[in-house]
């Protein structure tokens, strides 16, 4: 399992939100590139970037910062989400050196878009499923649909989606612990590797998540916990590495 630090971008700064609310944000750094360096130095092997302004605007807003991080760390796998709703945006990010793009809102509203993008950019598409009580939310979590996360995952099972980033909105940024059961269920029933997001607050959460790694949970994105110091990136990754032995 990989520990994947999250860098959420808002107005050019590195922030964390509580439950996806833009008005409830905490600034953790004015220079996201410096923040990326911090996590790389701590042993991160992959970064999760989110263009929060982009998620609400429907197009990239902090794209230049994403490119700057990709240029500085050309060998570091980076995944980016937020405002990715066109082939042009995907192509621009991949050309900039990003490894994966995360399709969220559009995956719910136009699932065929994911199918098309998997064909056009094979191996580079991740689907972001943000759910509340099992139902998928869209538009920066402003809207909750009637679509069940597991059903949508099954829809993409044969499309070549690299993985699914699964966020339990109720727990994101709230330091309440990860929803292990829902994450494992999605991995098992959906048939696509899952990266858990939302609620990984300490080593205990990580150890609980590790018990379901064999279902297809391949990583954990962590944000507020590493910024507030309740989880250490190096220690967490070392623990995950030890599980292989």
UniProtKB/Swiss-Prot annotation:
Query: Which residue positions does the secretion signal occupy?
Result: none
Give one GO term, molecular function aspect: 1-(5-phosphoribosyl)-5-[(5-phosphoribosylamino)methylideneamino]imidazole-4-carboxamide isomerase activity
Which InterPro entries does this entry report, sorted A to Z? Aldolase_TIM, His_biosynth, HisA_bact_arch, Isoase_HisA-like, Isoase_HisA-like_bact, RibuloseP-bd_barrel
Alphabetically sorted, this entry's keywords are: Amino-acid biosynthesis, Cytoplasm, Histidine biosynthesis, Isomerase
Q: Does the keyword Amino-acid biosynthesis apply?
A: yes
Q: What is its EC number?
A: 5.3.1.16
Keyword Ribosomal protein applies: no
Q: Active site annotated at which positions?
A: 8 (proton acceptor), 130 (proton donor)
Q: Which GO terms describe its biological process?
A: L-histidine biosynthetic process; L-tryptophan biosynthetic process
Where is this protein found?
A: Cytoplasm
Q: What class of enzyme is it?
A: isomerase
Family named by the database record: Belongs to the HisA/HisF family.
The record ties this protein, via NCBIfam families, to:
1-(5-phosphoribosyl)-5-[(5-phosphoribosylamino)methylideneamino]imidazole-4-carboxamide isomerase (TIGR00007), PRK13585.1 (NF010112)
What is the protein name given in its UniProt record?
Answer: 1-(5-phosphoribosyl)-5-[(5-phosphoribosylamino)methylideneamino] imidazole-4-carboxamide isomerase
Gene field:
hisA
């Amino acid at each position: 399992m990989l520990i994947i630090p999250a860098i959420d971008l808002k107005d050019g700064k590195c922030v964390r939100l509580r439950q996806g609310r833009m008005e409830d944000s905490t600034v953790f750094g004015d220079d996201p590139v410096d923040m990326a360096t911090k996590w790389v130095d701590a042993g991160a092997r992959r970064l999760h970037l989110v263009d929060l302004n982009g998620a609400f605007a429907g197009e990239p807003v902090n794209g230049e910062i994403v490119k700057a991080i990709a240029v500085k760390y050309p060998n570091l796998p980076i995944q980016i989400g937020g405002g990715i709703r066109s082939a042009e945006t995907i192509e621009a990010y991949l050309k900039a050196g990003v490894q994966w793009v995360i399709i969220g809102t559009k995956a719910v509203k136009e699932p065929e878009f994911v199918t098309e993008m998997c064909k056009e950019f094979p191996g580079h598409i991740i689907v972001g499923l943000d759910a509340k009580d099992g139902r998928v939310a869209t538009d920066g979590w402003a809207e909750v649909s009637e679509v069940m996360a597991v059903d949508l995952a099954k829809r993409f099972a044969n499309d070549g989606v690299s993985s699914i980033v699964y966020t339990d909105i109720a727990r994101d940024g709230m330091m309440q612990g990860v929803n292990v059961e829902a994450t494992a269920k999605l991995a098992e029933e959906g048939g696509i590797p899952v990266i858990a997001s939302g609620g990984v607050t300490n080593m205990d959460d990580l150890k609980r998540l590790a018990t379901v790694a064999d279902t297809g949970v391949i990583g954990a994105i962590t944000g507020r916990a590493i910024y507030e110091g309740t989880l250490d990136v190096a220690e967490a990754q070392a623990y995950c590495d030890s599980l292989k032995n």
